[in-house]
A protein has these predicted regions:
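Helix-enriched interaction subdomains in cytosolic or periplasmic regions
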Residues: 337-351, 458-473
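Flavin-dependent oxidoreductase catalytic cores
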Residues: 1-381, 385, 390-396, 400-401, ...
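N-terminal Rossmann-like dinucleotide/flavin-binding domain of flavoprotein oxidoreductases
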Residues: 412-458, 570-596
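Small-residue-rich anion-binding loops in enzyme active sites
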Residues: 320-336, 448-468
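Rossmann-like dinucleotide/flavin-binding elements
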Residues: 376-403, 445-453, 457, 465-474, ...
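Short connector loops at secondary-structure junctions
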Residues: 64, 215, 250-255, 405-420, ...
Length: 673
């Protein structure tokens, strides 16, 4: 029985047919610019095509050097570059898939000094100021887009996606906030949208009639001075007339201060926006953002919100997502949790994309899964992220794996993380591992403390025993009002109304989010999420912003977060999500103070020095989030007994809780042992 009839229905485009309603959305992987990038991209995309993706869209490639994402970024403007691309397109076609090249001119977001834009207005997220394009330069850029599309066809691509949203060049022409021209390319909306329309028209003319053209259209800019819904409809109709095959609806500029793809955003939070465009155009519409589950995708399409869904990061998490769904194995899907830690955050520091829950993503050629030649009996101590990743991957290769944990359930630190408001997706990772333990035949032993003697009979021992909270040397640290984050998050210790949190790392922020949450998290309610973040669901306001702005509720507790370092609190949080946590906590009234020296804790509260001045924080509880210590008690006795011992996860490096590193370490060891 097909549980997802709408999702797996074919889509007739006239000159070609897509086998289902799933578009793999564009993601920059960091491989586009690497010497071995073509071969690695080919393996990455081919694996997704093999498992049923109807149409893949590549990471953004600039039509001209002025539009690269960063200095040295990918460009397609010359026939000499075609062999690189043919490696990718041939690999996808061998697996029965279709692939489109995203043509992306980043405009004023280009992180290099020779950037261009409609007007010389610097982006708030870029240190470079763009050059304002002349009339002749605009015409040349239109030709660059058309040439890029023609080259894409020659390289074997089935189509292109013209990136017209997210605040990039085409979007900058459309919005009054970034287009302050008074010539034929600016002024009223008819002139501001001319560049977008001329680009699509030129692409269609050069690429031919039987070539897919997707236009990525911004439905909600989520910035002041952004577009209106009437303008969006006008543009969509003009883009269709100019030759677009599909319209893919985008949400939010990169400089917008409203979360659109991170874990706290509800699933399919913006499909209602796409639905508003249904009936206004006749080409298929694609909706996107936080669609990470086949049932969510099925519901979006079956209720008529869109004709297709775009899923990008979910295919990092699981290349087999669609084949598992279609074959009745949806419970085996490794679900994207929207954390961004191994994908977007990696890209922003110049590294290759991967995935927290699937470290093989974009590293398929370097991390092949092959049957074990020498099958071993392996003991894994600790069923946290590192231990789980090792156990299921090693067992899938044919090793006999026994997984021990002293607690009554698997998960380790993930069982704590999933309780943080907005991190409910972490339940999915634990569901996945529970199922894969069954599928791969891992022998799971819960509520079992093990000694070195219990492990002597195994060929090798993998210690993934995790961490213990570090106790800082502060006078009065054993006072009854002192709690660790485990006391609060795991053991549900009662916490008073006035709280000091020592430590502003990830655990400190998680604890503050947990204690400051008033009622249910809006991550499970689209309407409440939109109100909380000031999104205008009536689409009556420019930019899609409510006039009253965000309505983030206040914390029921008085919370102050403290750290020894003088740097900005939360500096080590992810680039794409850290600002969300900071903004949320500050809006709730949580205070953050760096540069603190801790003197003592007593009945009166926490005594500190701030800026060299003594202060007394009269709090009910002091919560310790001041780092971790590795738990490796078994390592030495096992080695003394002659056993081969591997340390992974927090028991190897415990400076900060890092699920990305833990799962990657466990997976790599499992694939090599």
């Amino acid at each position: 029985m097909n549980r997802y009839p709408s999702l797996f229905a074919p889509l007739d485009l006239g000159f070609t047919t897509l086998k289902n309603r799933v578009l793999m959305g564009s993601m920059h992987t960091g491989l586009e610019e690497r010497p071995d990038g073509a071969e690695r991209l080919a393996a990455f995309y081919a694996e997704r095509a093999r498992h049923g993706v109807a149409l893949i869209v590549t990471g953004g490639v600039a039509p001209a050097p002025s539009g690269v994402t960063m200095e040295g970024g990918a460009v397609l403007n010359d026939a000499s570059q075609l062999p690189h691309h043919r490696i990718v397109t041939d690999a996808v076609h061998r697996e029965g898939g279709k692939i489109a090249l995203q043509i992306l001119h980043t405009g004023r977001y280009s992180y290099q000094p020779n950037l261009v834009a409609p007007s010389a207005i610097q982006a708030p997220i870029n240190r470079f100021t763009p050059h304002a394009l002349s009339h002749d330069e605009i015409l040349a850029l239109i030709d660059d887009f058309a040439r890029c599309a023609a080259l894409a066809r020659e390289a074997g691509y089935d189509g292109v996606e013209v990136m017209g949203s997210e605040g990039y060049l085409i979007n900058e022409f459309l919005a009054a906030r970034t287009n302050q021209r008074d010539d034929e390319w600016g002024g009223d909306y008819g002139r501001r949208m001319r560049f977008a329309v001329e680009v699509v028209r030129a692409v269609r003319e050069r690429a031919g009639a039987d070539f897919i053209i997707i236009f990525r259209l911004s439905m909600l800019d989520l910035v002041e001075g952004g577009g209106t819904f009437d303008e969006t409809v006008q543009l969509a109709q003009a883009i269709e007339a100019a030759g677009a095959t599909i319209i893919n609806t985008g949400i939010g500029w990169h400089e917008a201060r409203i979360p659109t793809i991170a874990t706290p955003v509800p699933r399919a939070a913006f499909s209602w926006v796409t639905r508003k465009l249904k009936g206004k155009v006749s080409v298929p519409l694609v909706t996107t953002n936080r669609i990470n589950d086949p049932q969510v995708a099925e519901d979006v399409i079956s209720r008529g919100d869109a004709d297709m869904v775009s899923m990008a990061r979910p295919f990092l998490a699981d290349a087999e997502l669609l084949s598992k769904a279609q074959s009745g194995r949806a419970d085996e899907i490794n679900t994207c949790i929207g954390c961004n830690q191994a994908c977007l955050d990696q890209i922003f520091v110049g590294k290759v994309t991967s995935c927290l829950v699937n470290p093989r993503a974009c590293h398929e050629t370097k991390m092949p899964i092959v049957p074990a030649v020498n099958k071993k009996r392996l003991a894994v101590v600790g069923a946290g992220p590192a231990g789980l990743a090792f156990a299921v991957n090693a067992a899938s290769r044919g090793h006999s794996v026994t997984l021990f944990d002293a607690l009554a359930e698997i998960g380790g630190q993930f069982t704590i993380a999933r309780q943080i408001p907005g991190k409910e997706e972490f339940y999915e990772t634990l569901r996945y591992y529970r199922r894969m333990i069954e599928v791969t035949g891992v022998d799971l032993r819960l509520k079992q403390f093990v000694s070195a003697a219990d492990l002597i009979g195994f060929d090798e021992v993998i210690l993934a025993s995790g961490i213990a909270p570090r106790t800082p040397a502060i006078e009065g640290i054993d006072h009854p009002k002192v709690l660790s984050y485990l006391d609060v998050l795991r053991d549900k210790a009662p916490v008073g109304e006035k709280v000091a949190i020592i430590g502003c790392g990830g655990i400190g922020f998680d604890t503050a989010m947990y204690l400051s949450q008033p009622g249910e998290a809006t991550s499970q309610n689209i309407a409440e999420f939109c109100v909380e973040w000031g999104i205008d669901t009536s689409l009556s306001q420019s930019g899609g912003l409510r006039p009253e702005g965000p309505q983030l509720p206040k914390s029921p507790r008085q919370i102050v977060m403290l750290q020894r370092k003088a740097s900005k609190p939360g500096e080590g949080l992810g680039k794409t999500t850290g600002w969300i946590h900071r903004a949320t906590l500050l809006s709730r009234g949580v205070k953050m103070i760096p540069g603190v020296s801790y003197q003592k804790i007593d009945d009166d509260g926490l005594h500190v020095l701030i800026g060299g001045e003594p202060q007394l924080l009269r709090v009910d509880h002091v919560i310790l989030c001041a780092g971790q210590e590795p738990k490796r008690d078994l390592a030495d006795p096992l080695r003394e007994a002659g056993k081969t011992v591997h340390l992974i996860g927090g028991c190897d490096v415990a400076m900060e809780l890092d699920a990305r590193q833990a799962i990657a370490q466990g997976t790599k060891l499992a694939l090599s042992i």
